[in-house]
Amino acid sequence: MALTDRLLDAWYKGHPALTLLRPLESLYRRVVDGKRAKFLAGEGDIYRAPVPVIVVGNITIGGTGKTPLILWMIEHCQRKGLRVGVVSRGYGAKPPSLPWRVQPDQSASEAGDEPLLIVQRSGVPLMIDPDRSRAVQALLAAEPLDLILSDDGLQHYRLARDLELVLIDAARGLGNRRCLPAGPLREPVERLSSVDALLYNGATADRDDGYAFTLKPSALINLRSGERQPVSYFPAGQALHAVAGIGNPQRFFNTLEGLHWRPVTHAFADHALYSVQALTFTPALPLVMTEKDAVKCRAFAADDWWYLAVDAVPSDAFVGWFDEQLLRLSP
């Protein structure tokens, strides 16, 4: 088990050795608390865009379903006639320059897997740059936009925001509720009281402190041909290789099991880079991966490689609340 996997396991299941990391946790908290205090005091170089900025972020390390929810938000806003742009750090991307406008025909190594997925699915203008303020300014210089969505960036306080949404995995929760490196939290748990909404991925109903949303499998899409099939294409009991290089691979594997398939699971690091050799398994079976992984594998995909497309389905209460916020933020 890789070190990151062992840490995740300890954060969410407990381990006595984590107490040794608490002095480092105290130092980490001092730094993040200081950054937020400067932001609240209006100190430092803080950029406020001329259009509303909505941050869709995490307080924990690991995947929470951000990309599908952002895609839902894009589509929902576009149906209301809003021109939407997205900014992202572009984790793992190596563009020729920064900020960098992501195009659908670029490689994942150039654009980053999640930004490329968002552009290929939605067609929205998207700029990557670790400096999100600079990304927003470049995006607004290139396109007339009504709204900016920030893919993550909850802790990027140089960018002023009008709305903060935090996603939490309903099954894993906040782990041991401690900050890095003694726990999975990027900021102290008290930070959640200051955000505008919590969304629980996988919750079956809204909670007192937040809204529910689920990820619904919508189709199987062949990496090589683009052929689209319903999820019933594979019968119940179908054995297949399952590949996931995301923040929480087990959630993807659980989804496949929920479709009554029999996955042979292969978990990779988040944002992993793939090769034919890395994805050649025995016995020979169809291979199903996440859409985020698929954007990195199309160039060398075999005929029986598929990805499972999923759509975010937020609760009616969240949709109503979000519409109210859009109305409030409208000029």
Curated annotation (Swiss-Prot):
Q: List the disulfide bonds.
A: none
Annotated ATP binding lies at 60-67
Q: In which pathway does it act?
A: Glycolipid biosynthesis; lipid IV(A) biosynthesis; lipid IV(A) from (3R)-3-hydroxytetradecanoyl-[acyl-carrier-protein] and UDP-N-acetyl-alpha-D-glucosamine: step 6/6
GO biological process terms on file: lipid A biosynthetic process; lipopolysaccharide core region biosynthetic process
The organism's superkingdom is given as Bacteria
- Enzyme category, top tier: transferase
Q: Which InterPro entries match?
A: LpxK, P-loop_NTPase
Give the keywords, sorted. ATP-binding, Kinase, Lipid A biosynthesis, Lipid biosynthesis, Lipid metabolism, Nucleotide-binding, Transferase
Q: What GO cellular component is one of the record's annotations?
A: plasma membrane
Q: List the catalytic activities from the record.
A: a lipid A disaccharide + ATP = a lipid IVA + ADP + H(+)
| Keyword field contains Lipid metabolism | yes
Its Enzyme Commission number(s) read 2.7.1.130
Q: Which GO terms describe its molecular function?
A: ATP binding; tetraacyldisaccharide 4'-kinase activity
The record's similarity note reads: Belongs to the LpxK family.
What function is annotated for this protein?
A: Transfers the gamma-phosphate of ATP to the 4'-position of a tetraacyldisaccharide 1-phosphate intermediate (termed DS-1-P) to form tetraacyldisaccharide 1,4'-bis-phosphate (lipid IVA).
Name this protein carries in UniProt: Tetraacyldisaccharide 4'-kinase
Q: Which organism is it from?
A: Pseudomonas syringae pv. tomato (strain ATCC BAA-871 / DC3000)
